[in-house]
UniProtKB/Swiss-Prot annotation:
Keywords recorded for this protein, A-Z: Cell membrane, Disulfide bond, G-protein coupled receptor, Glycoprotein, Lipoprotein, Membrane, Palmitate, Receptor, Transducer, Transmembrane, Transmembrane helix
Protein name: Adenosine receptor A2b
Stretches of the chain found on the membrane's Extracellular side: 1-8, 68-78, 145-178, 260-267
Biological process, per Gene Ontology: adenylate cyclase-activating G protein-coupled receptor signaling pathway; cGMP-mediated signaling; G protein-coupled adenosine receptor signaling pathway; mast cell degranulation; positive regulation of cGMP-mediated signaling; positive regulation of chemokine production; positive regulation of chronic inflammatory response to non-antigenic stimulus; positive regulation of interleukin-6 production
Lipid positions (S-palmitoyl cysteine): 311
Compartment(s) where it occurs, according to its Swiss-Prot or TrEMBL record: Cell membrane
Family designation: Belongs to the G-protein coupled receptor 1 family.
Residues reported to bind adenosine: 174, 254, 279-280
Gene name as annotated: Adora2b
Keyword set includes Transmembrane: yes
Length: 332
């Protein structure tokens, strides 16, 4: 099948994004695994986020490319391809929400934080959040799908009954997942509320931090620790903001499709392609933010790339630098 120029460009850009997403987020996971300074509950949630982004590069983007070509397949196979990215998106949102709550506790109750948020509890929470993400993302399999309309043209069997269970459909996202699910359940129910909650949490974090910084009785050490927490919160708020900017265009188009179908029919194909590319590009951004905002991540990235990519031997001064870096173990 020969691709049009527009489709070929879309596929090429998706493949570039997939490669960068996998490489960058595998590097994040390796950095946390290799550096004791990065093995904090906050970063466990970031590893969960990175895992979702790796899966976007390995699976969701190839699935999206497949769906964009509109090949014929059975309904439930196409539905799985369409829903898998919803699972990963929901997992990312839950991971970001968990990080926001974690940072709020670190600033609101600093003396009790280490007892409340342990590595074991963080890993347990991550497991629960992934189960919830799969449940939410695969909800269309429970019946909230477009099977009746997608298979309405199936040929009837000899007894006059259409065999819809094995009827091939043109595998396009809107052919299998109804916009009512995407807008009312996915966006209004599962995406927008967590984003608004995170907005409130980060506003509260900065309000609490500013009040504490204004207290004259704060000792120099406590003040330095709090400033590091504020720096971490700013970095994480930046990640949430980038996530919202990357994903809201897709949801805006879905809302237009549902509420103004006549207007949606006239939209060029490239508009949706650009929105999808932007949402997938979000999986590339986070490692860049970590490297730019956090010395521990930056040092660990450099160490891993030097040793395993450039095949350079580690210098003797490396352990000393790692020791100096390990004093900052507050996430970002």
């Amino acid at each position: 099948m020969q691709l049009e120029t527009q489709d070929a460009l879309y596929v090429a850009l998706e493949l570039v994004i997939a490669a960068l997403a996998v490489a960058g987020n595998v590097l994040v996971c390796a950095a946390v695994g290799a550096s004791s300074a990065l093995q904090t509950p906050t970063n466990y949630f970031l590893v969960s986020l990175a895992t979702a982004d790796v899966a976007v590069g390995l699976f969701a983007i190839p699935f999206a490319i497949t769906i964009s070509l509109g090949f014929c397949t059975d309904f439930h196979g196409c539905l799985f391809l369409a829903c898998f990215v919803l699972v990963l998106t929901q997992s990312s949102i839950f991971s970001l929400l968990a990080v926001a709550v974690d940072r709020y506790l670190a600033i609101r109750v600093p003396l009790r934080y280490k007892g409340l948020v342990t590595g074991t509890r963080a890993r347990g929470i991550i497991a629960v959040l992934w189960v919830l993400a799969f449940g939410i993302g695969l909800t269309p399999f429970l019946g909230w799908n477009s099977k009746d309309s997608a298979t309405s043209n199936c040929t009837e069997l000899g007894d006059g009954i259409a065999n819809k269970s094995c009827c091939p459909v043109t595998c396009l996202f809107e052919n299998v997942v109804p916009m009512s699910y995407m807008v009312y359940f996915n966006f209004f129910g599962c995406v927008l509320p967590p984003l608004l909650i995170m907005l409130v949490i980060y506003i509260k974090i900065f309000m609490v931090a500013c009040k504490q910084l204004q207290r004259m009785e704060l000792m120099d050490h406590s003040r330095t620790t709090l400033q590091r927490e504020i720096h971490a919160a700013k970095s994480l708020a930046m990640i949430v903001g980038i996530f919202a900017l990357c994903w809201l265009p897709v949801h805006a188009i879905n809302c237009i499709t549902l509420f103004h179908p006549a207007l949606a029919k006239d939209k060029p194909k490239w508009v949706m392609n650009v929105a999808i590319l932007l949402s997938h590009a979000n999986s590339v951004v986070n490692p860049i933010v970590y490297a730019y905002r956090n010395r521990d991540f930056r040092y660990s990235f450099h160490k891993i790339i030097s040793r395993y990519v450039l095949c350079q031997a580690e210098t003797k001064g490396g352990s000393g630098q790692a020791g100096a870096q390990s004093t900052l173990s507050l996430g970002l």
